[in-house]
């Protein structure tokens, strides 16, 4: 059974970290790991992560740099990239591994926006349709990839925006 490395880039995310920190406690086990990569937070982000007992790596700012640094430090067979405001409450290790096995070397989850306003439900619907039809994913969708494939494709490009879309193309 493959091991999973969950990688979360952070930069001043204290206002949205609480929920993810609680959810990630369920992912602690002998095989898997959670790595937060901080790009120079000036708020309580680092303190919160360390108080929750998670691994924290310091990095230069820039999401691609942070994601790549976390990936290179990761020990898992599968890399799962999350955002600090991700909601993984409905994803179990078993369901994750089932999807990862079915998708092959990489994949993503449907986006779920917590705001129930109609406009956000419409946005989520169209983002999920686009991703399903084109296989182009955003980081909000929890991209996962085997570590060997990630290295083979050259990791995330060091660009300021859309590094997630570039990786999935």
What is each model feature region?
Residues 38-46, 86-87:
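A conserved acidic beta->alpha catalytic loop
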Residues 15-19, 43-51:
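Acidic helix N-cap motif at the loop->helix transition within catalytic regions
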């Amino acid at each position: 059974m493959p091991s999973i490395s969950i990688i979360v880039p952070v930069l001043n995310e204290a206002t949205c970290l609480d929920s993810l920190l609680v959810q990630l406690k369920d992912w602690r086990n002998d095989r898997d790991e959670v790595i937060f990569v901080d790009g120079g937070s000036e708020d309580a982000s680092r303190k919160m992560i360390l108080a929750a007992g998670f691994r924290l790596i310091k990095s230069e700012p820039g999401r691609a740099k942070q994601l790549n640094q976390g990936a290179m430090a990761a020990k898992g067979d599968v890399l799962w990239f999350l955002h600090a405001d991700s909601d993984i409450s409905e994803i179990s290790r078993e369901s994750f591994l089932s999807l990862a096995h079915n998708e092959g070397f990489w994949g993503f989850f449907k986006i779920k926006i917590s705001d129930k306003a109609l406009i956000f439900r419409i946005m989520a619907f169209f983002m999920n349709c686009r991703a399903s039809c084109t296989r182009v994913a955003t980081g909000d969708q929890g991209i996962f990839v085997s570590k060997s494939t990630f290295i083979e494709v050259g990791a995330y490009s060091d660009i300021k925006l859309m590094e997630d879309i570039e990786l999935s193309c």
